[in-house]
């Protein structure tokens, strides 16, 4: 009995050991992590794609052709969407922003294209005989005398329609546009004739700025910093995503920034390096200051033919008083504004005195406030604006204006580059324009003395990039990376669609889950992927309409070319992502498990740390150095899987025996059979011929082909008797050599018999093999069934044992509890009886004592 118990215990331990081993293997397998591909994750990186424009060009004057080419832009969105990104911090750098460079090149190209069809003024590089203008009106205003000095009445010889004929023409030129040939002489020439070519702006080209919205192509996004005190560089904690910027007016000006955006809070000082006096300082005001500029002279314009098909527009006469152009600014508002700027600068230089002074010198465009007003280019002296002495004496109760004396030029040095100039045709009538000063461009003087207590700031400008930078400081373009990889436990399994029910996130933008954890963001993949594709389709439709609108033009504008580029770029981005998904075997899937094991060297963080605490942006930075390695492993894994599937498909042809009887297979069998038979017959013929040739060489001469030779009879038959005329013996005879057909028949018969015997043997072997396999399979099934029954009985036995043990445990517990209860009750009874017997015992004691 003891031996039987030991044997049973050993058997049980063996079974439990196997079960424990398999449980350990399953748990170990479940602990592995595998690479999972996600499409539509909110991840981005800095990028420099080609941007396209949107504008409401139709809302402006259609009679003139604006040089900005906004008629070729897509229409603006009437309800632009701006999506805030919670828990997102992004670094911005306005001084290294590709959007600024791109806008700068676009404006240059637009100016060049706008002036291409216009007239070249090379024929005007002739000697000009100029005299002062005679004013018939008697006035004593100093501004008139100043205006008289500003313009000259010039005569010059010009070519007519016939090149060999010349005639004299008269025109008024500004003094800034001509230079004397000799000192004290009345002979002049145009100022740019010896340095650059001059192109006259087309008369119907408008230079008035129209707001331009820069938009990112599909697959990209524009991030916007909404911090009110953002200085242009560093981290921004209030970030949103937009598809287009706000309307930016391409105002070309120096010293003062006009018609831009104002700061929402306090005045902001933006600089790249304040200690470097060569760097510009951009000031954004929180309140705009109105500046009103006018050219009071009522000018007329006349056209002068300077050659076949060429017309030069010049100032013909000035009707009424000749007064100098000027600008007016409210002294109270300006001084308050300058005082705010001074206070902001004082924070950066706490122990020094801040002073403002006029420009120290340079080109006219830099030393003055240059801008375009109604088609004329004004150059205004800002000495009265930047004057610290007047600022200290300022009385806030005054309502006076600061007047800036302005000069006008018609020959403009093109700010786009050196060696090019533009002639602005004169504008008829009185010119007046109102603008808003929204910012300043300043530079700091270098410290001439080491212990100087003053910091001097002067107005500056000239680099139009700073003008665009003052508006684009809060934007940056990023490329959306919808593909993400992360470790998960499942390995190449398909998640059922019913498990991804409605998520209630249909109103989230593509990057709306950027600040969420990876686990929360992965829920919105369907919405984000759908919005990515719909955004591509919508933008492609808008761009195509804008391109079709330009078909009547012989040459696309800058915007048309950029629209084509962005159209191609968006499609390339989408196709590239889809190609990667296809290479990895994840086409059409938002969450795609793979068979690539996760390497802990890529990231050793746990599942909870990754999915519950990290955003997709943080995770992307975590594994950015290993992304290429993971992508290569995904490709290798998919190639191996494709190879395995190909091998499996090759085996599937033999999966069904009925495929053997397919007509195409039988045709293949017949071809093989015919080749085998033909080969055997050919070999027999060759060997027969070789045998005959060999015998002939040995001297053998065959008998007649019809000679019969007797076939030996059997030993049980007697020979015939000729004399008695008995029956002749029926001896069998064979031919010595058969004919070709007979030989072919014998060979074919032998081959068929050989094939029959071999096939019969093969069928018998196959039948025997199938029989053995059937018996083995039957035995295996029987053993499996017995094993299952044994396992079932084992489970049943242990279930009964556990049931009995539980019953015994309950019985024992009940007995123990019952006995304990009885003993407790008995103890209580004894105590109660003893308590009740106390009087009796006392009485009995007293009785005993009294007796």
Curated annotation (Swiss-Prot):
The signal peptide, as residue positions, is 1-31
Q: Where is this region: V3?
A: 293-326
What Gene3D superfamilies does the record tag this protein with? Answer: 1.10.287.210, Human immunodeficiency virus 1, Gp160, envelope glycoprotein, Single helix bin
Q: Is Plastid one of the keywords UniProt gives this record?
A: no
Disulfide partners: 53-73, 118-202, 125-193, 130-154, 215-244, 225-236, 293-327, 373-433, 380-406, 586-592
Q: Where is this region: V2?
A: 154-193
- Ranges for the region named MPER are 650-671
Q: Region entry V5: which residue ranges?
A: 449-460, 451-460
Which segments carry the region annotation V1? 130-153
Residues on Cytoplasmic side: 694-851
Single annotated GO MF = structural molecule activity
Motif, YXXL motif: chain positions: 700-703
> Where is region (Fusion peptide) located?
501-520
| Region described as Immunosuppression | 562-580
List all topological domains (Extracellular): 32-672
Q: What else is known?
A: Inhibitors targeting HIV-1 viral envelope proteins are used as antiretroviral drugs. Attachment of virions to the cell surface via non-specific interactions and CD4 binding can be blocked by inhibitors that include cyanovirin-N, cyclotriazadisulfonamide analogs, PRO 2000, TNX 355 and PRO 542. In addition, BMS 806 can block CD4-induced conformational changes. Env interactions with the coreceptor molecules can be targeted by CCR5 antagonists including SCH-D, maraviroc (UK 427857) and aplaviroc (GW 873140), and the CXCR4 antagonist AMD 070. HIV-1 lineages are divided in three main groups, M (for Major), O (for Outlier), and N (for New, or Non-M, Non-O). The vast majority of strains found worldwide belong to the group M. Group O seems to be endemic to and largely confined to Cameroon and neighboring countries in West Central Africa, where these viruses represent a small minority of HIV-1 strains. The group N is represented by a limited number of isolates from Cameroonian persons. The group M is further subdivided in 9 clades or subtypes (A to D, F to H, J and K).
Task: Provide the domain comment.
Answer: Some of the most genetically diverse regions of the viral genome are present in Env. They are called variable regions 1 through 5 (V1 through V5). Coreceptor usage of gp120 is determined mainly by the primary structure of the third variable region (V3) in the outer domain of gp120. The sequence of V3 determines which coreceptor, CCR5 and/or CXCR4 (corresponding to R5/macrophage, X4/T cell and R5X4/T cell and macrophage tropism), is used to trigger the fusion potential of the Env complex, and hence which cells the virus can infect. Binding to CCR5 involves a region adjacent in addition to V3.
Query: What is the official name of this protein in its record?
Result: Envelope glycoprotein gp160
């Amino acid at each position: 009995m003891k031996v039987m118990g030991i044997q049973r215990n050993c058997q049980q331990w063996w079974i439990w050991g196997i079960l424990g081993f398999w449980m350990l293997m399953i748990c170990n397998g479940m602990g592995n992590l595998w690479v999972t591909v996600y499409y539509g994750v909110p991840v981005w990186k800095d990028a420099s794609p080609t941007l396209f424009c949107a504008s409401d060009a139709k809302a402006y004057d259609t009679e003139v052709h604006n040089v900005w080419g906004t008629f070729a832009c897509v229409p603006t969105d009437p309800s632009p969407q701006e999506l805030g990104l919670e828990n997102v911090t992004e670094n911005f750098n306005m001084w290294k922003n590709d959007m600024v460079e791109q806008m700068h090149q676009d404006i240059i190209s637009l100016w060049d294209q706008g002036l291409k069809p216009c007239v070249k003024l090379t024929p005007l590089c002739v000697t000009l005989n100029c005299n002062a203008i005679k004013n018939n009106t008697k006035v004593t205003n100093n501004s008139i005398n100043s205006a008289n000095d500003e313009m000259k009445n010039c005569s010059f010889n010009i070519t007519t329609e016939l090149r060999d004929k010349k005639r004299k023409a008269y025109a008024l030129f500004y003094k800034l546009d001509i230079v004397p040939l000799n000192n004290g002489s009345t002979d002049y020439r145009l100022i740019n004739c010896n340095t650059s070519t001059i192109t006259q702006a087309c008369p119907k080209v408008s230079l008035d700025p129209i707001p331009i919205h820069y938009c990112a192509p599909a697959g990209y996004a524009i991030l916007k910093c909404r911090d009110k005190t953002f200085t242009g560089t560093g981290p921004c904690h209030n970030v949103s995503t937009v598809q287009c910027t706000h309307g930016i007016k391409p105002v070309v000006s120096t010293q003062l920034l006009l018609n831009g955006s104002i700061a929402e809070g306090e005045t902001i000082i933006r600089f790249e390096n304040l200690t470097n006096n060569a760097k510009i300082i951009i000031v954004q005001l929180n309140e705009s200051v109105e500046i009103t500029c006018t050219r009071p002279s009522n000018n007329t314009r006349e056209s002068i033919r300077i050659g076949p098909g060429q017309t030069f527009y010049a100032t013909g006469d000035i009707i009424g008083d000749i007064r100098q152009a000027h600008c007016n600014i409210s002294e109270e508002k300006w001084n308050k504004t300058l005082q705010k700027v001074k206070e902001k600068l004082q924070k950066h230089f706490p122990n020094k005195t801040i002073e403002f002074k006029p420009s120290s010198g340079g080109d006219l465009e830099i030393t003055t406030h240059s801008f375009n007003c109604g088609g004329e280019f004004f150059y205004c002296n800002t000495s009265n604006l930047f004057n610290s002495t007047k600022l200290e004496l300022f009385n806030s109760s005054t309502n006076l204006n600061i007047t800036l004396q302005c000069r006008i030029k018609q020959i403009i040095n093109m700010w786009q580059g050196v060696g090019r100039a533009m002639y602005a045709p004169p504008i008829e009538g009185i010119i007046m324009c109102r603008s808003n000063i929204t910012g300043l461009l300043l530079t700091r003087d270098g410290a001439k003395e080491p212990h100087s207590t003053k910091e001097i700031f002067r107005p500056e400008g000239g680099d139009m990039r700073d003008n665009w930078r003052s508006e684009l400081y809060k934007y940056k373009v990023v490329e959306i990376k919808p593909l993400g990889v992360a470790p998960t436990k499942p390995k190449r399994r398909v998640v059922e669609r019913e498990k991804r029910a409605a998520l209630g996130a249909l109103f989230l933008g593509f990057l709306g889950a950027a600040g969420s954890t990876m686990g929360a963001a992965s829920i919105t993949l369907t919405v984000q992927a759908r919005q990515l594709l719909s955004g591509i389709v919508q933008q492609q439709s808008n761009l195509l309409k804008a391109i079709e609108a330009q078909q009547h033009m012989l040459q696309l504008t800058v915007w048309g070319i950029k629209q084509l580029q962005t159209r191609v770029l968006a499609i390339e981005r989408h196709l590239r992502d889809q190609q990667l998904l296809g290479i990895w075997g994840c086409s059409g899937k938002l969450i795609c498990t793979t068979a690539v094991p996760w390497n802990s060297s890529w990231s050793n963080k746990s599942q909870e740390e990754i999915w519950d605490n990290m955003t997709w942006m943080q995770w992307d930075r975590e594994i950015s150095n290993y992304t290429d390695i993971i992508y290569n492993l995904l490709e290798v894994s998919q190639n191996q899987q494709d190879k395995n599937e190909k091998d499996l498909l090759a085996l599937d042809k033999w999966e069904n025996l009925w495929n053997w009887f397919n007509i195409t297979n039988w045709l293949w069998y017949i071809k093989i059979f015919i080749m085998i038979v033909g080969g055997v017959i050919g070999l027999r013929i060759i060997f027969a011929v070789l045998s005959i040739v060999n015998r002939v060489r040995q001297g053998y001469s065959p008998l007649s082909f019809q000679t019969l030779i007797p076939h030996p009879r059997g030993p049980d038959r007697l020979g015939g008797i000729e004399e008695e005329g008995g029956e002749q013996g029926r001896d069998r005879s064979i031919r010595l050599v058969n004919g070709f057909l007979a030989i072919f028949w014998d060979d074919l018969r032998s081959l068929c018999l050989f094939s029959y015997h071999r096939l019969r043997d093969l069928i018998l072997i196959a039948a025997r093999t199938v029989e053995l396999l059937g018996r083995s399979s039957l035995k295996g099934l029987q053993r499996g069934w017995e094993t299952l029954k044994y396992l079932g009985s084992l489970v049943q036995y242990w279930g009964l044992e556990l049931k009995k043990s539980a019953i015994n445990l309950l019985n024992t517990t009940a007995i123990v509890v019952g006995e304990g209860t009885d003993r407790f009750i008995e103890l209580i009874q004894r105590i109660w009886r003893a308590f009740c017997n106390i009087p009796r015992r006392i009485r009995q004691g007293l009785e005993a004592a009294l007796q």
